[in-house]
């Protein structure tokens, strides 16, 4: 029930595919990142400090506090969405196609950032993606779904070396860039 779920919600956060539509255009970066902290009944100084820490973690300057989503690039917006999730110090981060709306250079930067954050903060990810190149670069284990059915589940290395289903083989083949 709702009462039992409430404490668990702080343990996980989600970052959506399209950072522009997931950010409120009326809130600046500071308000966006700090919004969830308001529920924690923290002192203003601590909220401010945690916002600064979150910006630093995602490699955005403190000066971005006053910017609005329309003033940011796609990669910067995705970093704000990550900071908004990280500021609550979750144990699990659900990443729903977090790089699909970004160009390849920005994708690589976000994947590198996600790897660093995972190592530094011991965060687990559920990474949802159709881009197997990004999955290969970031994930340790892969669960392949087809029409809500589990096709296979194994280490990323084994999945790419020895896929167990024809469907997975086709996905891998289709993801190879010429």
Model-identified regions with their sequence ranges:
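ABC ATPase NBD coupling module
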Residues: 1-13, 39, 158-163
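Conserved ABC ATPase "signature" region
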Residues: 38, 45-63, 172-173
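Conserved ABC ATPase signature
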Residues: 68-72, 76
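A short, proline-enriched helix->beta-strand linker immediately N-terminal to the Walker B motif
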Residues: 87-91
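A short, surface-exposed alpha-helical micro-motif characterized by mixed small hydrophobic
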Residues: 135-137
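ABC ATPase "signature
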Residues: 153-154
């Amino acid at each position: 029930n709702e009462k039992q779920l409430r404490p668990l919600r702080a343990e996980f956060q989600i970052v959506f595919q399209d950072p522009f539509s997931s950010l409120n255009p009326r809130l600046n970066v500071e308000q966006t990142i700090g919004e969830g902290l308001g529920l924690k009944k923290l002192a203003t100084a601590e909220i401010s400090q945690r916002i600064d820490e979150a910006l630093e973690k995602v490699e955005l300057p403190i000066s971005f506090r006053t910017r609005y989503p329309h003033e940011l690039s796609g990669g910067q917006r995705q970093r704000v969405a990550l900071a908004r999730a990280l500021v609550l110090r979750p144990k699990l981060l659900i990443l729903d196609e977090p790089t699909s709306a970004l160009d390849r250079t920005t994708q690589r930067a976000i994947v590198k950032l996600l790897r660093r954050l995972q190592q530094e903060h011991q965060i687990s990810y559920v990474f949802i993606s159709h881009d197997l190149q990004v999955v290969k670069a970031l994930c340790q284990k892969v669960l392949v779904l087809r029409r809500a059915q589990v096709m296979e589940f194994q280490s990323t290395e084994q999945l790419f070396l020895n896929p167990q289903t024809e469907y997975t083989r086709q996905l891998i083949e289709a993801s190879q860039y010429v």
